[in-house]
């Protein structure tokens, strides 16, 4: 997950700037030819830049004058996570390693402590934006997860090798933090704030169900919580990350046919489901959907639609209601997408990344199963080239 925000001042509806980067065939890691730990400035080009409206159609508006610097740290690391502390240090977690850069990505060093796991089945990382606590989560088979944490930019660590709630068999592990509320688990949280200021959440799949736990001791243990009841227990399980808003609202996205967000207002004690996106649906098999919240707790839910474009629905009342007319994020020229991610800053300022392809000539040709390819990235052959698309909007709340 990348924190990418840029300035844009438009007055005509929600406007999106899309920048296309780094071509490669197939799905997986993006590779460059520069040395490990170095940084490479992206090439300037007049192609691969789109300015679109909420329908994915092009607008006659000049793009932002953006410059990008890329680092190849961890380019072969599976399922990476990234976070930034208030000191400006960047933490990149993949496989069992925690890599740190305090010079804007120009150089990197490994800072994994002996209190952290030396093996992994699935990694995940999180930086608490309020306390700067760095969490390194390493799944140990399907039985449990080993979580270690640092409060001094990775100089020292503490850890718990069995730190994944009360119920074993976990997969698709996620961790996040957020403020305590005044109800549910928040009542106990108000008493534990002297130990750690924030609630810490740990969620995972068990079969097709979602389990979520809340920690009262800064992530050292997860004793409160269990299976989320409702749609998420019987249809798809967890696939997106956990998101917590500044007002304490928590969001989890299930892997279901109709785009859905599961919301808690009491630090994970109870959960409600909210659906949207019936106008665009989802593909099969269904992939990641994600939620981001801005500094005023407006929520932005993105997912891959049934036509393989990336779509968004917004909530301006802390997840109580969601717009039912979906906004297209990806340009119409992009006919296949996967792995969308979103982040938000000040109100209306969002950044989205995803992998996408414009190889429309491959539509209808045999896919990996020998069927006519419809644009579903899950079935794409190596003849389909995917790019990293980076999308910006400064007025994502406009109608």
Regions found by a protein language model. Give the residues of each.
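Secretory targeting signatures
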Residues: 1-47
């Amino acid at each position: 997950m990348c924190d990418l925000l840029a300035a844009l001042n438009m007055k005509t509806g929600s406007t999106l700037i899309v920048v296309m980067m780094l071509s490669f065939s197939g799905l997986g890691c993006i590779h460059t030819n520069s040395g490990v730990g170095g940084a490479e400035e992206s090439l300037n080009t007049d192609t691969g830049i789109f300015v679109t409206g909420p329908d994915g159609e092009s607008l006659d508006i000049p793009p932002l004058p953006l410059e990008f610097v890329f680092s190849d740290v961890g380019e072969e690391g599976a399922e990476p996570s990234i976070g930034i502390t208030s000191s400006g240090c960047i933490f990149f977690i993949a496989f069992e390693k925690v890599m740190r850069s305090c010079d804007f990505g120009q150089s990197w060093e490994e800072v994994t402590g002996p209190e952290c796991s030396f093996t992994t089945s699935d990694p995940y990382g999180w930086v608490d934006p309020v306390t700067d606590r760095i969490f390194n989560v390493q799944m140990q088979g399907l039985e449990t997860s080993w979580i270690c944490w640092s409060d001094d930019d990775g100089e020292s660590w503490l850890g718990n090798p069995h730190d994944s709630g009360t119920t074993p068999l976990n997969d698709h592990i996620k961790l996040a933090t957020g403020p305590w509320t005044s109800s549910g688990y928040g009542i106990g949280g108000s008493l534990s704030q002297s130990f750690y200021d924030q609630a810490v959440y740990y969620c995972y799949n068990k079969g097709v169900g979602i389990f979520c736990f809340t920690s009262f001791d800064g992530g050292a243990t997860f004793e409160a919580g269990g299976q989320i009841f409702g749609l998420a227990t019987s249809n798809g399980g967890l696939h997106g990350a956990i998101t917590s808003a500044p007002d304490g609202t928590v969001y989890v996205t299930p892997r279901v046919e109709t785009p859905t967000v599961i919301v808690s207002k009491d630090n994970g004690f109870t959960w409600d489901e909210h659906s949207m996106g019936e106008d665009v649906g989802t593909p099969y098999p269904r992939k990641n959907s994600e939620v981001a919240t801005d500094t005023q707790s407006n929520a932005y839910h993105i997912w891959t639609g049934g036509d393989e474009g990336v779509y968004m629905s917004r909530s301006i009342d802390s997840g109580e209601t969601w717009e039912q007319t979906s906004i297209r994020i990806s340009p119409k020229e992009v006919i296949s997408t996967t792995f969308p991610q979103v982040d938000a800053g000040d109100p209306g300022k969002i950044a989205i990344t995803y992998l996408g392809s414009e190889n429309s000539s491959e539509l209808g040709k045999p896919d990996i199963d020998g069927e006519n390819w419809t644009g579903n990235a899950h079935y794409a052959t190596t003849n389909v080239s995917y790019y990293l698309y980076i999308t910006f909007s400064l007025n994502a709340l406009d109608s």
